UniProtKB/Swiss-Prot annotation:
Interacts with TTN/titin and YBX1. Residues 61-89 form a coiled coil. May play an important role in endothelial cell activation. May act as a nuclear transcription factor that negatively regulates the expression of cardiac genes. The gene is ANKRD1. This is Ankyrin repeat domain-containing protein 1. InterPro entries: Ankyrin_rpt, Ankyrin_rpt-contain_sf.
Length: 319
């Protein structure tokens, strides 16, 4: 087996017969190996034996050596990892560099819609549902009546309250829309807000003087509606604003009757916590307890727990 000396490996020269560099792989014949060794060992190759090269080869090797020196300088400029703080600094620098490279897409804000054509009543009512404020503004700026309604006497305010479009509700009220306007079922805006579940709209209506005790054709209050539709935050806000917990609708049902019948456990707990009457009877002579069916175990457990706690409290008070 032929043994090569270190000098032969590095310089590409072979002692004895044969051409220089003929034993090296093709990729290493043009000087890459020398540059790689320079970079890896971080030392100069001036101690290597000098061999004759042409002017072109000398320029090429000079360029390679210059590149190697630049790489060496870059390596020397890198932060040395002496402790965890150094590692953390490097990680932060990497993140910052990556962040700079990441191009943030520029999102253009949609241009405001400008309505120039006259707006008719169907377009106006549809815009209240679809939250198209420019259409609403155009209709109102043309001195039209904000309380125009459809065949069921539902106004734009009713529709906007149902969908929770706060800006449109504000604009309609500013234009003089009647908060207590009643539709065919005698529901007012506060009924529609409770049905839609928008707490912000509900708060706005109450701040503008909407009647919290308003009744529709079924004698339902806004609290009845919020409980039936399961809008907990609206129900809680109505209670906080002193809505009648034991108000009866046309069938004599209180909000608690409705909550029990619909298995709304959170509503049941909310109403009882704030003092709803467990023993009030509806027109059929039924209390909320009487409406609890055998399969409604969750509701029964709540009632049993509350009854037990109230019994213990009464015993303690007796002493």
């Amino acid at each position: 087996m032929m043994v090569l000396k270190v000098e032969e490996l590095v310089t590409g020269k072979k002692k004895g017969n044969g051409d220089a560099g003929e034993f090296l792989p093709e990729d290493f014949r043009d000087g890459e190996y020398e540059a790689a060794v320079t970079l890896e060992k971080q030392e100069d190759l001036k101690t290597l034996p000098v061999h004759f090269v042409s002017l072109g080869e000398q320029q090429w090797k000079t360029e390679k050596q210059r590149e190697a020196e630049l790489k060496k300088k870059k390596l020397e400029q890198r932060s040395k990892l002496e402790n965890l703080e150094d590692l953390e600094i490097i990680i932060q620098l990497k993140k910052r560099k990556k962040y700079k490279k990441t191009k943030v897409p520029v999102v253009k804000e949609p241009e405001p819609e400008i309505v120039t054509e006259p707006v008719d009543v169907p377009m106006f009512l549809k815009a209240a549902l679809e939250n198209k404020l420019p259409v609403i503004e155009k209709f109102l700026s043309d001195k039209n009546n904000p309380d125009v309604c459809d065949e069921y006497k539902r106004t734009a305010l009713h529709r906007a309250c149902l969908e929770g479009h706060l800006a449109i509700v504000e604009k309609l009220i500013e234009a003089g829309a009647q908060i207590e306007f009643r539709d065919m079922l005698e529901s007012t805006a506060i009924h529609w807000a409770s049905r839609g579940g928008s707490l912000d709209v509900l708060k706005l209506l109450l701040n503008k003087g909407a009647k919290i005790s308003a009744r529709d054709k079924l004698l339902s209050t806004p609290l009845h509606v919020a409980v039936r539709t399961g809008h907990y935050e609206c129900a809680e806000h109505l209670i906080a604003c002193e809505a009648d917990l034991n108000a009866k609708d046309r069938e004599g049902d209180t909000p608690l009757h409705d909550a029990v019948r619909l298995n709304r456990y959170k509503m049941i707990r909310l109403l009882i916590t704030y003092g709803a009457d467990l023993n009030v009877k509806n027109c059929a002579g039924k209390t909320p307890m009487d409406l609890v069916l055998h399969w409604q175990n969750g509701t029964k457990a709540i009632f049993d727990s509350l009854k037990e706690n109230s019994y213990k409290a009464s015993r303690i008070a007796a002493f």
